[in-house]
C-alpha cells in the first residue's frame, strides 16, 4: 500500500485516523463530519455532465497486511464483508465489488453462514467477484509461474466456494505491471484489467480506457482508476473531479469507486444515500450502482468506441519496492524455484519410479507463497513484525518442497544399483528439459581418497574433480567438486574410488590477484573491482579494465517506497581497501576471495572460475550497517550503442538506458558494439529485483537501508530509535556471462534456469537395483522453449506441462516425453505460454489454458 497522491481531498492525518479506526467505525454509518457529503447539492454540474454515465463501484480495499499484522487483516476482512452484507439488506440495488480468493477461504473456514450469504448475493449479481487471484500481489516481482498459480488457485477457489469465477482482473494498488500480464490474464479466463498505479503524474497514457497488448499479441481491455480506489469524502466532488478531465477521454462511461478502504470498511450509509440522491439531481450525469463486469460489458458493446493500444509495461510507482527487505525477496525467489522443482520431480517420479506426489501439501505451500506475494509484503513496505511472519511462511513452503524432492530422489536412488562397497556413489539429477554440463559440490567422507581419488560416470569415463574444505571442522569430511554432463530432465550416477585422477590439459589456476582458464583472464584491483579479459576476442569486458562490480554507495534519504524517486544517482562513496586471498587453485576450479569495507559495513565476494567455462561466478556476503544509504553493484560494460534487456515474468523487455530504477527478474543484459563487432554482458542473480542502466553502466541494487513502514511526509527524528531495513548479513549469488553472440544465441534464460535451480546431488548407499545408472525422462529440441512447470493436474491424475518461448522468436518444437512413451510437436508464436495436458493412460495430449482446461 502506498498512499502517495491517493487520498483525493482527504489529508494524510485523516487517512491514518480512518485506517486506525477500522471498519467497525464505518459499519456505524456516520452521516456527519468526515464522511458527510457536506454541501454537495450546492455544487453546480458542468453543462455537458448529462452526457456521461458513472458506474458506481462499491468497494472496500483491504490490505491483509501492511501497517498491521495478517491476524488483524483476517478480522478486517470479516467486518468489511459483514458491513457490505448489511448495506445490501438496507438498499436493494446496492452492489459491492471485492477481490482475493484468500479472503473467502478465511470466511469459509471461520464463518460458513456468512459465506452462504455472500454466495446468494453473488448469484443475484450484486456481489461482484473480481481479480481471480489469490491476493492482489506485486505485479513485477513474482515469477511468471507464480502469477500463473495466483490465477489457478484463485479462480478455482472462487468457483468452489462461490459458484463463479472472475472475468475482470484487478490490481489497483500494485506498484507497476509487467507487460507480459495480458497473456497470463486472458489464459486465466479474464478479458479485462483494472489498475491505478502508476498514476497520471508517473506515466502518461493516451486514455484511461485502452487495449493493453502484451508482446505475444494478446490484448485485454484495461481501465486506470481515476483519483483513487478509496473515496471517504464527497461522492459528488469525486464525480466532478473526473468530469473535469472527461473531454480528454474517448469514452462517455466511467467507473466511480467509493468506500472506505485499506483497513477495510467499504461503502458507508451516507455515500449510498448520496448516490441515490444524485440519480434524480438535475443536470447530473447518469449515476447508478454497478459492477466492474457491467462496466466492461457496456463499453465492449459500444461498437463506435475507438480506443488506443498500449504495448508498453505500466511503470513506475515506488521504485524502492524493488529492493526493500532483501530477505523476503530472496526467500520468495527460493520458494518459487523449490516448489517448481519439487513438482517436476515428484510428478514424473509418481509415474515412473513410484514417488509420492503430495498434492495437498503443494497446494498449501503455494497458497502460503502467493499470500506473501501480496504487494505490501513482497515489496517490503509492511511493518517490521511482518518480517517474521514472512520468514515462517517461506520456511513452511521450502520445507514442503525440500522434503518432497528429497523423498522422491531417495525413492529413485534406491532403485539405481550402487554395488561396490569400496566406492562411494552420488546420483545427480537435472531438473531442466535440456542436457547440461555442471559443477557439482557434495560433502563426503574423504578417507583414503585424500591423496588418490578417481571419479567416473556410469560409463567409466573419468571426471575432472578436486577436493576443497567441507562444511564441518572434524577433518573427516571434505567437499568433492566434480564436473559432469547430466541428461535432460534426468540423472546420472557418478562413482568415487581409489585410483588415479583425471589429468586434464584444460585446467584453471589462481595466483595473487589473477585467475585464468583457456578463455578468460580475471583480475582484481586494489579497490576490489574485477576485470575480465576475453582471450579469444582479445577484449576487455569492462570499460577501463578492472572496473567491474564496483560496490557504489548512494545517498538515499527517501521513505520505504522511495516516493517521487525515479533513480538513485547521488553517489557518496564506494567499498574499497581490498584484501585478496586465493581460496582454490584448480585443477577444476579457481576461487579468489575479495574483501572490502565501507563505514560500518563489510563485503566479501568469493569469485570462482571453472576449467573450460566462459562465465565467472560470485558468492556475495554483505554485512550491512548503513542508514539511509543504498548499495549498488556497477558493471560498466565496454560497448557502444548499448541495449538493455531485462527478464520479466515469463518474458523480457528492452528499456531505455537513462538511469531510471527498473524492476527485473533473474537477469539483466547489456549488449552493443565494440570496434565493429558485437559484445555484451549478462548478470544473473538468485535474489535481486532492482536494476538500473545509464549509458553503458549496468547496475544491480543490492541493499536499501530505509526505515520500516516510513511514509512521506513523516519526517524522521534522527535522534530517535528506528527499525532499519536490511541490517546485518545477507548472501546471494551472481553469474557474469560475457558474450560476443547475442544473449538469445547463448540461451541466457536456460543458463539462468540452471544457475537458480541447479542440479541436485544425493548420496547413494550400497545396494542393488533394477533402474539404469543414467536416464532422461523429458527433453525439448528448441533452445528458446523452456519447460517451466511439470505437475499433476488439479483434478484427476493427468500431467500438466508448461512451456514458454523465451527469445521473442516463433519456433516449431518437439517435446520428447520419454517418461510416457510419447512425443508432442507444435508451433510457438513469440513469447507464447503453452500448457499441455497429458493423459498418462491413453497418451492423449491436448492444449489447455492456465486453469488446466
Language-model segments: what does each one mean?
Residues 45-67, 185, 513-524:
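An acidic-aromatic substrate-binding cleft motif
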Amino acid at each position: 500500500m502506498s498512499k502517495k497522491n491517493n487520498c483525493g481531498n482527504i489529508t494524510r492525518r485523516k487517512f491514518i485516523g480512518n485506517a486506525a479506526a477500522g471498519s467497525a467505525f464505518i459499519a456505524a454509518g456516520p452521516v456527519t463530519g468526515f464522511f458527510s457529503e457536506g454541501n454537495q447539492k450546492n455544487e453546480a454540474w458542468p453543462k455537458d455532465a448529462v452526457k456521461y454515465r458513472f458506474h458506481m463501484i462499491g468497494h472496500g480495499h483491504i490490505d491483509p497486511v501492511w501497517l498491521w499484522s495478517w491476524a488483524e487483516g483476517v478480522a478486517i476482512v470479516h467486518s468489511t464483508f459483514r458491513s457490505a452484507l448489511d448495506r445490501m439488506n438496507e438498499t436493494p440495488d446496492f452492489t459491492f465489488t471485492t477481490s482475493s480468493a484468500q479472503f473467502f477461504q478465511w470466511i469459509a473456514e471461520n464463518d460458513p453462514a456468512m459465506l452462504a450469504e455472500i454466495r446468494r448475493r453473488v448469484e443475484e449479481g450484486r456481489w461482484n467477484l473480481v481479480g481471480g487471484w489469490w491476493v492482489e500481489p506485486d505485479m513485477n516481482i513474482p515469477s511468471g509461474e507464480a502469477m500463473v498459480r495466483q490465477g489457478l488457485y484463485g479462480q478455482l477457489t472462487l468457483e468452489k466456494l462461490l459458484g463463479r469465477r472472475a472475468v475482470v482482473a484487478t490490481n489497483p494498488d500494485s506498484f507497476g505491471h509487467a507487460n507480459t500480464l495480458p497473456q497470463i490474464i486472458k489464459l486465466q479466463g479474464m478479458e479485462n484489467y483494472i489498475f491505478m498505479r502508476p498514476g497520471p503524474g508517473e506515466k502518461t497514457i493516451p486514455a484511461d480506457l485502452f487495449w493493453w497488448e502484451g508482446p505475444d499479441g494478446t490484448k485485454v481491455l484495461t481501465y486506470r482508476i481515476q483519483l483513487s480506489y478509496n473515496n471517504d469524502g464527497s461522492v459528488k466532488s469525486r464525480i466532478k473531479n473526473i468530469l473535469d478531465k472527461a473531454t480528454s477521454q474517448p469514452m462517455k462511461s466511467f467507473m466511480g469507486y467509493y468506500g472506505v478502504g485499506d483497513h477495510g470498511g467499504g461503502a458507508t450509509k451516507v455515500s449510498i444515500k448520496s448516490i441515490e440522491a444524485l440519480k434524480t439531481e438535475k443536470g447530473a450525469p447518469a449515476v447508478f450502482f454497478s459492477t466492474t463486469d457491467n462496466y466492461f460489458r457496456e463499453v465492449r458493446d459500444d461498437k463506435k468506441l475507438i480506443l488506443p493500444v498500449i504495448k508498453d509495461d505500466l511503470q513506475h510507482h515506488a521504485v524502492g519496492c524493488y529492493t526493500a527487505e532483501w530477505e523476503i525477496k530472496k526467500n520468495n525467489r527460493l520458494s518459487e524455484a523449490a516448489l517448481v522443482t519439487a513438482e517436476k520431480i515428484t510428478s514424473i517420479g509418481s509415474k515412473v519410479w513410484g514417488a509420492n506426489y503430495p498434492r495437498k501439501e503443494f497446494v498449501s505451500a503455494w497458497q502460503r507463497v502467493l499470500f506473501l506475494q501480496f504487494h505490501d509484503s513482497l515489496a517490503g513496505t509492511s511493518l517490521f513484525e511482518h518480517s517474521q511472519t514472512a520468514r515462517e511462511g517461506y520456511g513452511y513452503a521450502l520445507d514442503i518442497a525440500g522434503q518432497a524432492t528429497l523423498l522422491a530422489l531417495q525413492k529413485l536412488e534406491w532403485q539405481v544399483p550402487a554395488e561396490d562397497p569400496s566406492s562411494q556413489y552420488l546420483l545427480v539429477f537435472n531438473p531442466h528439459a535440456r542436457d547440461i554440463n555442471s559443477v557439482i559440490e557434495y560433502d563426503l567422507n574423504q578417507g583414503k581418497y585424500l591423496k588418490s581419488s578417481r571419479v567416473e560416470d556410469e560409463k567409466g569415463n573419468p571426471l575432472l574433480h578436486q577436493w576443497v574444505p567441507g562444511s564441518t571442522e572434524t577433518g573427516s569430511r571434505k567437499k568433492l567438486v566434480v564436473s559432469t554432463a547430466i541428461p535432460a530432465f534426468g540423472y546420472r550416477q557418478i562413482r568415487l574410488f581409489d585410483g588415479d585422477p583425471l589429468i586434464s590439459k584444460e585446467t584453471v589456476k589462481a595466483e595473487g590477484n589473477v585467475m585464468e582458464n583457456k578463455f578468460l583472464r580475471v583480475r582484481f584491483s586494489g579497490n576490489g573491482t574485477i576485470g575480465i579479459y576475453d582471450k579469444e576476442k582479445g577484449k576487455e569486458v569492462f570499460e577501463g579494465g578492472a572496473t567491474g562490480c564496483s560496490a557504489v554507495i548512494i545517498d538515499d534519504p527517501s521513505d520505504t517506497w522511495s516516493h517521487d524517486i525515479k533513480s538513485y544517482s547521488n553517489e557518496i562513496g564506494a567499498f574499497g581497501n581490498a584484501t585478496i586471498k586465493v581460496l582454490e587453485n584448480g585443477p577444476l576450479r579457481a576461487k579468489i576471495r575479495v574483501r572490502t569495507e565501507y563505514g560500518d559495513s563489510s563485503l566479501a565476494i568469493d569469485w570462482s572460475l571453472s576449467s573450460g567455462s566462459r562465465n565467472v561466478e560470485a558468492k556475495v556476503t554483505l554485512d550491512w550497517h548503513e542508514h539511509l544509504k543504498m548499495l549498488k553493484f556497477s558493471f560498466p560494460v565496454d560497448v557502444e550503442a548499448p541495449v538493455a534487456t531485462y527478464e520479466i515474468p515469463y518474458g523480457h523487455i528492452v528499456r531505455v538506458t537513462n538511469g531510471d530504477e527498473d524492476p527485473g527478474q533473474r537477469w539483466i543484459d547489456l549488449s552493443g558494439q565494440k570496434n565493429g563487432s558485437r559484445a555484451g554482458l549478462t548478470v544473473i542473480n538468485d535474489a535481486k529485483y532492482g536494476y538500473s542502466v545509464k549509458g553503458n553502466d549496468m547496475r544491480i541494487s543490492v541493499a536499501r537501508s530505509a526505515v520500516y513502514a516510513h511514509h512521506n511526509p513523516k519526517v524522521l527524528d534522527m535522534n530517535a530509535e528506528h527499525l532499519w531495513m536490511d541490517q546485518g548479513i545477507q548472501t546471494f549469488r551472481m553469474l557474469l556471462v560475457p558474450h560476443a553472440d547475442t544473449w538469445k544465441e547463448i540461451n541466457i534464460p536456460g543458463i539462468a534456469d540452471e544457475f537458480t535451480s541447479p542440479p541436485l546431488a544425493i548420496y547413494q548407499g550400497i545396494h542393488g537395483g533394477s533402474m539404469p545408472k543414467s536416464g532422461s525422462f523429458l527433453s525439448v529440441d528448441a533452445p528458446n522453449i523452456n519447460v517451466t512447470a511439470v505437475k499433476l493436474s488439479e483434478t484427476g491424475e493427468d500431467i500438466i506441462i508448461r512451456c514458454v518461448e523465451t527469445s521473442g522468436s516463433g519456433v516449431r518444437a518437439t517435446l520428447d516425453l520419454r517418461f510416457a512413451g510419447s512425443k508432442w510437436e507444435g508451433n510457438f508464436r513469440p513469447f507464447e505460454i503453452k500448457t499441455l495436458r497429458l493423459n498418462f493412460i491413453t497418451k492423449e495430449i491436448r492444449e489447455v489454458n492456465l486453469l488446466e482446461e
